[in-house]
A protein has these predicted regions:
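Gram-negative outer-membrane beta-barrel transporters
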Residues: 373-374, 668, 673-678, 694-795
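Outer-membrane beta-barrel translocator/receptor signature
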Residues: 70, 96, 113-115, 127, ...
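N-terminal Sec signal peptide and the immediately downstream disordered periplasmic leader
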Residues: 1-70, 76-80, 242, 312
Length: 856
């Protein structure tokens, strides 16, 4: 037993099906290696069932067998099979980012919709929290690369991930999988299906995934980065005739985990202050799984929904598809965001509730002639309610005092003298901070269509369109209780300076009461300019250091909206289209040429970092005489209010693509060469105290993708995928980057710079061999490896990463359906930091997420 545990073991697919079920439901059993892997693969990338060979789109397909053999549990693991897809998990389980061809966003803010759309059984999952659960009883996963807005709508400017699950069967069967691995990992998955009548079939699937954390909070003696999730999924299929089918799906899954560990990459100058307060930091250990905190990082997600799909043949040549769905997501997170044992940040918690309703209708033709069409409509309605808070902990006041040489607390008396409403002893008080409440609504309508016209037997001209109207509205009710951040230091210093000068001159003149009048000060300055300069310099030396405390004003007052100037609404309309010419040379080789556009609607910044646009407000204290602006004119200006963005404008994508596909007995390939352009890419960058949301004027990439499969002999199959990307910011004057000398972020002109996080080369290769040990037993050996060339992790910093993953499995399969598998993932255990960010409220400190360990 010890030997088996060393290499990893799982009991796989303990089937309760008879052999005939396994034949009718290949998605529920491993694909035998001796099968012809070049056989036609059916996909629905064009919203029609077509072979992969006949689909003129760059599509990567992961079958159920590949997912099983590589031990892929969720979309985070899927990137090891599709090199042009990159998935990154950030500070919580709910913050996962999907990137295709170097384009992608949508994490860290509920108001930002992703550029990569995720669909499960045709239903859009609008946020990553609704996408990251363990994959259900799947049939295949399709990754559509490049803009797909013509058929998939407003949030497909970079691509689509489409997960297709198995329908209920009219023959009784099922599957049970139980797995045990390192870190006490226990995974149980099962499904059962069968008929209730000749026209009604049902299925029920469930999963349970629990694992100890591979990281630890040293001072708390608690685990981090654990797994604790489960889900259940039920389906009803009613098919009274071959012309009508109704499929109803209901599902619920839950995540209750501690995630995600953060490593100290560089301990900046503030580290000394943390340690002086008795705090602990695992300094300069970029790949360590040991960290310090005051509370574990809580991640709780409830994801649920129901959908109904109707497929009806209206006439002999027309079919109607209707998909109606409701999705709900509840998210709760809480984190000690300073990532030290010093109690600097008390709470950083967030409660989010998302309700989404979608309705899609499609009318499809099936004419015998050269002309066929698809015409559809789509409705989207989403409501988000978000509340959260970030508060100071027990040590924050002392931390600020240490950094300011005592000036933070020592300034209270002076500042209270010119701000009489300030409470005493409240600078940096425990529990002060920001308190947020957002109500967000998004409503969108679209009509779309596609026409195929066969010019000749092999040549087809296609054209498609999508017209979308998207309306968003946000209402905020936010407040800051940070007393120190509410003070106008410029005005306070000006008042203290004037008072100090008046008092000094009054003393020299013997003025009763001790303070000279303005007229007396002016007369003194005229009569004795040298003396006045000396007095001014002396007073300035006393009061000007207060201006150096501005960086400690972390949480200034928030201007809520809608208000008299800002209506809190956006309205976007877009016409996306596709023009494609496809040519089939013969039954084995086909090609296509495509020009397509894509669209992503505006995204609101649902965080305390939401600020008025510069067109509405020019910041500055009244004593500095800032230029007039609408918000100031309306009397809405607040102390320390700054400008920024309320929302990022829409993304508009375009792609030029040429593809070539081949399929022979034992060998197939798909090649796509492209140039892709994205105008208005929505950039959301963390800068240590918050996120900067904006638009890059233009970002582009060019490259190619090659997917191939080779079966040289009956029992041996090889797969390979290669992606080459050459991206750059063509225009991004308002970017954000690190200063490598200080490790702090700031504005940067990134025009002409290669975006961080994008490899030039990415490859994924795999091999599967089947050995017939007897008539009733076979052995399936599988190995796959993916590698990405080095890339810059964070804009402006020298750190680079070159990720790789090696996975392997060995399966013994009995003819009666019982299988036993030993498996391992990430066996080479490479060390790198996929993400680096500035330390929270710790200038000069760098933090990051360490790469995960091997599992088996």
């Amino acid at each position: 037993m010890n030997r088996i545990q060393f290499i990893g073991a799982s009991l796989f697919a303990l089937a309760i099906a008879n052999p005939s079920f396994a034949q009718t439901a290949p998605q529920a059993a491993p694909q035998p290696a001796e099968e012809d892997n070049s056989a036609d693969i059916i996909v629905t990338a064009s919203k029609r069932a077509q072979t992969l060979q006949d689909t003129p789109i760059s599509v990567a397909v992961a079958s159920a067998a590949q997912i099983e053999q590589s031990q892929i549990r969720d979309l985070l693991d899927l990137q090891t099979l599709v090199p042009s897809l990159k998935v990154g998990q950030l500070q919580s389980s709910a913050n996962t980012n999907f990137i295709i061809r170097g384009f992608g966003n949508g994490a860290n803010n509920a108001g930002i919709e992703p550029s990569v759309g995720v669909f499960i059984d045709g239903v859009y999952r609008s946020r990553s929290a609704a996408q990251i659960g363990d994959l259900p009883n799947i049939e295949r996963v399709e990754v559509l690369r490049g803009p797909q807005s013509t058929l998939f709508g407003k949030n497909a400017s970079a691509g689509i991930i489409s997960i297709v699950t198995a329908e209920p069967k009219f023959e009784f069967g099922g599957q049970l999988e139980a797995s045990y691995g390192n870190y006490n990992a226990i995974v149980v998955k099962g499904n059962v299906t069968g008929p209730l009548s000749e026209t009604l079939a049902v299925s029920l699937a469930g999963s349970y995934n629990k694992r100890d954390g591979y990281a630890r909070y040293v001072n708390l003696n608690q685990e981090n980065n654990n797994r604790n999730r489960y889900g259940i999924r039920g389906q009803i299929l009613w098919q009274p005739s071959s012309d009508f089918k109704l499929r109803i799906i209901g599902d619920y899954d839950k995540i209750d985990e501690v995630c995600c560990t953060v490593a100290n990459i560089f301990d900046g100058p503030t580290g000394g202050a943390v340690r002086a307060l008795g705090g602990q930091i695992n300094s300069n250990q970029p790949y360590s799984f040991n960290s310090f905190a005051n509370i574990p990082s809580v991640n709780k997600i409830d994801n649920y929904g129901v959908s109904a799909q109707v497929d009806a043949r209206v006439t002999d040549t027309l079919s109607l598809v209707s998909i109606t769905a409701y999705r709900g997501v509840k998210i709760f997170t809480n984190q000690d965001s300073d990532f030290t044992s010093a109690d600097l940040i008390g709470d950083n918690r967030s409660n989010t509730k998302i309700d989404t309703f979608t309705q899609e209708l499609r009318l499809l033709s099936d004419f015998d002639g050269p002309f066929n069409f698809l015409l559809g409509g789509y409705y989207f309605n989403e409501k988000i309610r978000n509340s959260g808070q970030l508060t100071f902990g027990q040590s924050f006041r002392n931390y600020a005092n240490f950094l300011s040489g005592g000036g933070y607390g020592g300034s209270e008396a002076a500042l209270r003298s010119v701000n009489p409403g300030l409470p005493a002893g409240q600078f940096g008080g425990v529990g002060q901070g920001r308190f947020e409440n957002y109500n967000y609504r998004d409503e969108a309508f679209s009509v779309f269509g596609n026409v195929d016209f066969k010019i000749t037997d092999g040549l087809t001209l296609s054209g498609g369109f999508n017209y979308t109207i998207d309306r968003k509205a946000v209402v905020t009710n936010n407040r800051s209780t940070d007393v120190f951040s509410s003070i106008d230091l410029d005005a306070s210093v000006a008042t203290l300076r004037a008072g100090g000068i008046a008092q000094t001159i009054g003393g020299l003149l013997g003025v009763p009461g001790g303070f000279a009048s303005a007229a007396q000060v002016a007369a003194f300055a005229t009569a004795n300019p040298a003396g006045f300069t000396a007095i001014s310099n002396g007073v300035n030396a006393q009061v000007n250091p207060l201006l150096g405390l501005k960086p400690l004003q972390f949480i200034p007052p928030f201007l809520n909206f809608p208000n008299a100037v800002e209506n809190g609404k956006t309205k976007d309309s877009n016409f996306s289209y596709t023009v494609r010419l496809a040519y089939k040379f013969n039954r084995n080789i086909s090609s296509y040429v495509t020009y397509a556009t894509g669209f992503k609607a505006s995204s609101f910044n649902l965080s305390i970092d939401s600020r008025p646009f510069p067109r509405d407000f020019i910041p500055g204290s009244p004593v500095t005489n800032p230029a007039p602006s609408a918000i100031r004119t309306a009397g809405l200006a607040l102390n320390n209010l700054t400008s920024g963005t309320r929302f990022a404008g829409p993304e508009n994508a375009a792609v030029y693509e040429v593809g070539l596909k081949g399929n022979w007995q034992g060998f197939s390939f798909n090649l796509a060469v492209f140039k892709q352009i994205l105008k208005g890419f929505q950039s959301n960058v963390f800068v240590g105290t918050g996120f900067v949301l904006g638009n890059a004027e233009k970002q582009s990439t060019q490259g190619f993708e090659l997917d191939a499969s080779l079966t040289p002999i009956r029992n041996l199959n090889f797969t390979a995928s290669i992606t080459y990307l050459d991206p750059k910011f063509d225009s991004f004057a308002g970017g954000t980057a690190f200063n490598p000398l200080t490790n702090n972020t700031g504005p940067a002109n990134l025009t002409g710079v290669r975006p961080s996080g994008v490899s030039e080369w990415s490859i994924a290769v795999g091999a599967t061999h089947t050995t017939e040990l007897s008539d009733s037993l076979k052995m399936i050996a599988h190995i796959d490896y993916d590698h990405a060339s080095s890339f810059v992790i964070a804009q402006g910093l020298p750190f680079k990463a070159s990720p790789e993953t090696l996975n392997a499995s060995l399966t013994f399969a009995l003819r009666n359906g019982l299988e036993v598998t030993a498996w391992g993932r990430n066996l080479t255990e490479p060390l790198f930091n996929p993400v680096i960010f500035p330390g929270v409220a710790q200038s000069g400190t760098l933090s990051g997420y360490p790469s995960p360990p091997k599992t088996y």
